[in-house]
Curated annotation (Swiss-Prot):
This is 33 kDa chaperonin. It comes from Pseudomonas entomophila (strain L48). One of its GO terms (cellular component) is cytoplasm. HAMAP family: HslO (MF_00117). Under oxidizing conditions two disulfide bonds are formed involving the reactive cysteines. Under reducing conditions zinc is bound to the reactive cysteines and the protein is inactive. GO terms for molecular function: protein folding chaperone; unfolded protein binding. It holds the Pfam family HSP33.
Length: 300
């Protein structure tokens, strides 16, 4: 990580007198990197920021080594949103959109009507997990809250917001019974935490530090705030991966593709717009066992 001030991080907190944990996320530089790759309309900027924040919060609830992929799809003006977040806290994202169909005040239902979001966990070791989030809430916060209640059967409340410069998120989640084992007490305790979490305003999340937000919400509770976990924008594309894609076609088809493309194949990364060019000599070298001219899988 750099020596610049921390603007991109997650931060856990815990209630000492309740079976509840929480997590907050702040995104600025990584959010700006994602938005800089394409000319996104403002409503799409907001959706991307909220989904980035959601990905960071979700990884905080999981214990795995690997990759979390969020893909929202619809038949509306925004047919695709995609976020990838690794257990090393690297994040990247993109959206596809029809700009002429997007109004400045468009909301989730306008942008992605009838949409759904697929959540995929790809561990380094172990089986892939996939879950589905219906985009039938008023906003992404409500959609993800419903997902946890319906699919994971865990009391969870999520608040997400983004303004094109900053993206923020707050998650509170009930833990297994340790402090309040009585069912009624346990439900009352959760209801208290959730009710206060639901009062947080977008301007508070965007404009205040985490400690201040938590004090405003839970000043009567014993809350411990842990150290931050920095995160960053990092794209996993590389010349080596692009080379492997060509090799997977087979030598005959790869050489035919070069000819069809006028002598040079261009492979573009949709996430970061990096371009990788391969001419006939490059392709011949790949199949001669010469490898690529970039020996390692450089990421940026």
């Amino acid at each position: 990580m750099s020596d610049l001030p921390d603007t991109d991080f997650t931060q856990r907190f815990l209630f000492d007198d309740r079976d509840v944990r929480g997590e907050m996320v702040a995104l600025e530089r990584s959010y700006a990197e994602v938005l800089a790759k394409h000319a996104y309309p403002r409503p799409v900027q907001h959706l991307l920021g909220e989904l980035m924040a959601a990905a960071a919060l979700l990884v905080g609830t999981l214990k795995f080594d690997g990759l979390l992929v969020l893909q929202a799809q619809s038949q509306g003006p925004v047919p695709l949103l995609a976020i990838e977040y690794t257990s090393e806290h690297d994040i990247r994202g993109l959206a596809r959109f029809e700009a002429e169909q997007i109004k400045d005040d468009a909301r989730l239902a306008d942008l992605m009507p009838g949409g759904h979001l697929v959540l995929t966990i790809i561990p380094v070791n172990g089986q892939r997990y996939q879950g589905t989030v219906e985009l039938d809430g008023q906003d992404l916060s409500e959609c993800f809250t419903n997902y946890f209640v319906m699919s994971q059967q865990v009391h969870t409340s999520i608040s997400l917001t983004a303004d094109g410069v900053r993206a923020r998120g707050l998650l509170v989640q009930q833990l297994p019974a340790e402090i309040h084992k009585d069912i009624e007490e346990r439900e009352e305790s959760w209801a208290h935490v959730k009710a206060l979490a639901n009062t947080v305003k977008a301007e508070e999340l965007l404009g205040l530090d985490n400690e201040t937000v938590l004090h405003r919400l839970y000043h009567e509770d014993a809350v411990r705030l842990f150290d931050i976990q920095p995160l960053r924008f990092r794209c996993s594309c590389s010349r080596e991966r692009s080379s492997n894609a060509l090799v997977s076609l087979g030598e005959q088809d790869a050489k035919a593709l070069v000819e069809e493309c006028g002598g040079t194949v261009e492979i573009d990364c949709q996430f970061c717009n990096e371009r990788y060019l391969f001419d006939a000599s490059d392709v011949a070298q790949l199949f001669a066992g010469g490898g690529t001219d970039v020996p390692s899988e450089t990421q940026h």
